[in-house]
Amino acid sequence: NKKLIKKKYFENMNDDNNLFLTNWFNGFVYDSDKFWFEVDDFDESAGDIKGVWELSRWYWVVRIAADSSLTHNKKLLLLHDKTSEWMRQNPYLLGPNWKCGQEVSLRVIHFIFSLRLLGLGPAHLDGSQVEFIKIHLDRILPTLSYARGQKNNHWISEIAALFIGGVWLRNHHISRKKPYIEIAVKQLRLALKKLFNDDGSFAQSSFNYLRHALTLISIIKLESEVEGVDIK
């Protein structure tokens, strides 16, 4: 399914009408005028919601940033254009792509990681990029307790997004008002105790979820070292 979705996406790279609102499993197009909590989880006509979430996880921005066939300026232009197009189709808190905190987290992590691959850092953020990161973190915060209650990979994903995003925003006079980093570090310490057993195994009996959690923790550590943020 992922191969099919990727193929369909890149074939429609320049066809932006409802690109990020389309369920690529069945072609269903979601409305973007409903708050995320009004989107029906069990609408049979919509099908599996992961079909619309897939593109909005933004793994493809990393692919753009790493594409050796594109110039640096072309990559920046593509990233800017696709970010603007995504926001046009997905106004803040409206539509299916704001529904899940983990999906929101993966999107902003991939966005920031793509900037890293392009040789950019927090000091290079423009106003639209700052706002893009901020609204994602602000969506995660109110439902973080829900992710914590699940005691699974969702919790780690949202912690990682808050930490990494908070690090990138800290010199833009935003995270002083909302202590994203402090919240993330506190939650990370708790999650490490709750989600990992003494033998190193994970709370979920899945190597994939264990790998996912360890990857995110590694990214948190790397980001803390690069930007000089103490997480001990």
Question: What annotation goes with each model-predicted range?
Answer:
Residues 16-28, 33, 44-45:
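Terminal targeting/low-complexity segments that flank the catalytic cores of oxidoreductases
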Residues 4, 15, 26, 34-36, ...:
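Low-complexity, compositionally biased segments
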Residues 1-19, 23:
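Extreme N-terminal leader/anchor segments
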Residues 32-34, 39-42, 46-232:
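Aromatic-lined, polymer-binding surfaces characteristic
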